[in-house]
């Protein structure tokens, strides 16, 4: 079986909450219709991934609640988010922002911490899912902290795997944590894989050995609880959605170096 994927925009965590991705969604969050709100910590809440996640939380107030929000420097946006979503804790990496951030949320019973180390500790506070959306290597300490605590981490930070893949996956395996890709093509692969492993590749586009592409559907949305053997997937053909080579002529690709 071959999986063909082409995504032109970041789907982040949004499609995981969409009906078309119900199998993957239920694997990450459990049954969001159970009546018990899923607790989220959002690392990088003032960035693109964080804002997209909060938009879904706002649209589904009975399904999700915010335990902690973490940002880098934008204390004004973080304070506004905190007043709307009422987390128990918020963190700002920029220690100089601690004073104004505390003043902005005073009287709302929200614990405020500052500094990269303290923000990383917030990632270990028990929740259902930690959304890791901090950009670059700055996001690595909080990802490691979450996995060391056995958390389920919705990972939008590719740099964590590029720079410390063995450490990240090792911590997840050693402590019962889970890594869930939620950024762009990585999430697309995950969702297709979960659908394929559950009753025949739900809602994905597949191509057989002859290259013909066909749509398949399966209406079963029950959660997957076991690990899945990828041996049945022969090849993944992943087209780029952007990056530094987006406008490069095809004839120049042979000159690309690591």
Residue ranges and their predicted role:
Residues 67-105, 110-111, 116, 123:
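Glycine-rich nucleotide/cofactor/substrate-binding loop typically near the N-terminus or early
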Residues 194-203, 221-258:
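Conserved anion/nucleotide-ligand pocket segment
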Residues 141, 158-177:
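Rossmann-fold NAD(P)-binding glycine/threonine-rich loop
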Residues 24-90:
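N-terminal Rossmann-like dinucleotide-binding module
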Residues 114-145:
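Beta-loop-alpha module in the N-terminal Rossmann-like domain of NAD(P)-dependent dehydrogenases
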Residues 134, 151-162:
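ADP-ribose/adenylate-binding Rossmann-like module
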């Amino acid at each position: 079986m071959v999986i063909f994927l082409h995504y032109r925009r970041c789907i982040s965590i949004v499609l995981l909450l969409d009906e078309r991705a119900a199998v993957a969604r239920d694997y990450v969050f459990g049954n969001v219709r159970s009546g018990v709100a899923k607790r989220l910590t959002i690392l990088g809440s003032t960035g693109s991934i964080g804002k997209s996640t909060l938009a879904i939380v706002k649209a589904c107030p009975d399904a999700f609640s915010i335990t902690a929000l973490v940002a880098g420097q934008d204390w004004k946006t973080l304070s506004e988010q905190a007043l709307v979503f009422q987390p128990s804790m918020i963190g700002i990496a920029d220690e100089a922002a601690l004073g104004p951030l505390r003043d902005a949320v005073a009287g709302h019973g929200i614990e405020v911490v500052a500094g990269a180390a303290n923000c990383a500790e917030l990632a270990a506070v028990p929740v259902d899912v930690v959304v890791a959306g901090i950009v670059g290597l700055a996001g690595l300490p909080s990802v490691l902290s979450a996995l060391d605590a056995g958390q389920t981490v919705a990972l939008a930070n590719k740099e964590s795997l590029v720079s410390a893949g063995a450490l990240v996956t090792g911590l997840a395996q050693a402590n019962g944590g889970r890594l869930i890709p939620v950024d762009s093509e990585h999430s697309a692969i995950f969702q297709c894989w979960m659908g394929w492993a559950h009753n025949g590749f739900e809602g994905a586009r597949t191509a057989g050995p002859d290259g013909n592409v066909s749509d398949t559907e399966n209406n079963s949305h029950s959660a997957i609880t076991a690990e899945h053997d990828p041996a049945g997937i022969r090849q993944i053909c992943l087209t780029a959605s952007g990056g530094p080579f987006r406008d490069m002529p095809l004839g120049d690709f042979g000159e690309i170096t690591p």
